[in-house]
Swiss-Prot record:
Transmembrane segments: 2-22
Keywords, alphabetical: Cell cycle, Cell division, Cell inner membrane, Cell membrane, Membrane, Transmembrane, Transmembrane helix
Region (Disordered): 47-107
Organism in which the protein naturally occurs: Pseudomonas putida (strain W619)
Keyword Transport included in the entry's annotation: no
Gene from which the chain derives: zipA
Protein's job: Essential cell division protein that stabilizes the FtsZ protofilaments by cross-linking them and that serves as a cytoplasmic membrane anchor for the Z ring. Also required for the recruitment to the septal ring of downstream cell division proteins.
Designated name of the protein: Cell division protein ZipA
Length: 294
């Protein structure tokens, strides 16, 4: 069998490629041995204890310091905005807070600031809310704090009138409004605060729609009334639209469970359209407030 030039060239190429691969493998193996030898020599020259302390020491110190720094810095960063807001609302009371817990500070301040606002709401309400003597005493108790509050410009009123001739009975009425989060307070009427427990700013209030407009808890078992009125003043809560929704829910619950009828501030039947009109009044008030600030 004769071998042509083409076959010889292919055979020579294969031999050359095999030689190149073998040479590369030999060099690579020799290089690994030298590198390992150099690393062994470099580590053998380092001190056993001091060298390891210098290499590992800094990383351990940094790791142990990170967690305490983050934990300690997070706590003041969360409470600082609340403290600054309290100082702006009640600068005269800043030095009397002492060692109150961070959660209790806004609740106490909001109670003192928001509750005196109710006399203004009551004074602007319907004649059915007549309680002149109680309003005057409320103003006297408020003192200088009431003077710092902005005047109430608008009052949103929802009345619940009993369909029964006997009216709303005291025990049933009390149980119903307590379930809605209202608590007995300033001016002998009920207030709904931010917290269901009765802490935080006042969102809205509920008064007796029959003179003298108050509730007597000592005689609540024998108490009855033909109507009650929920009212929300503007300016008032920080989030008036949400507060209004809570007020509507409380009024609807009372009307549904105690056989009452919802009325608006004109003593007309409260409809979905009327509720939407109330919401629009809130939006317009907020828009005017922003315009005045600018």
């Amino acid at each position: 069998m004769e071998i042509g030039l083409r076959e010889w060239l292919i055979l020579i190429g294969i031999i050359v490629i095999a030689g190149i691969l073998f040479d590369g493998w030999r060099r690579m193996r020799g290089g690994k041995g030298k590198l390992k030898f150099r690393l062994d020599r470099s580590y053998s020259n380092l001190p056993d204890e001091e060298g390891s302390a210098e290499v590992l020491g800094p990383s351990r110190v940094l790791d142990t310091q990170k967690e305490p720094e983050l934990d300690e810095s997070d706590l003041p960063s969360l409470s600082a905005p609340a403290r600054e807001r309290e100082r702006e609302q009640k600068p005269a009371k800043a030095t009397k807070r002492g060692k109150r817990a961070a959660e209790m500070q806004p609740q106490g301040d909001l109670d003192l600031v928001a509750e005196p606002r109710e006399p203004d709401l009551f004074a602007d309400a319907d004649d059915d809310f007549a309680g002149d003597n109680n309003r005057n005493s409320g103003f006297a108790a408020a003192g200088s704090a009431a003077k710092e509050l902005p005047p109430v410009e608008e009052v949103l009123v929802i009345s619940v009138i009993s369909r029964d001739e006997g009216g709303f009975k005291g025990p049933a009425l009390l149980q119903n409004i307590l379930e809605s989060g209202l608590r007995f307070g300033e001016m002998d009427i009920f207030h709904r605060h931010e917290s269901m427990a009765g802490h935080g700013e006042v969102l809205f209030s509920m008064a007796n729609a029959v003179k003298p407009g108050i509730f007597d808890l000592d005689d609540i078992d024998h108490f009855s009334t033909r109507a009650v009125s929920f009212f929300l003043g503007l300016p008032g809560p920080r989030h008036p639209k949400q507060a209004f929704d809570v007020m509507v829910a409380a009024a609807r619950k009372l009307a549904h469970e105690l056989n009452g009828e919802l009325k608006d501030d004109q003593r007309s039947v409260l409809t979905a359209q009327t509720i939407e009109h109330y919401r629009q009044r809130i939006v317009e008030f907020e828009r005017r407030a922003l315009t005045q600030k600018r």
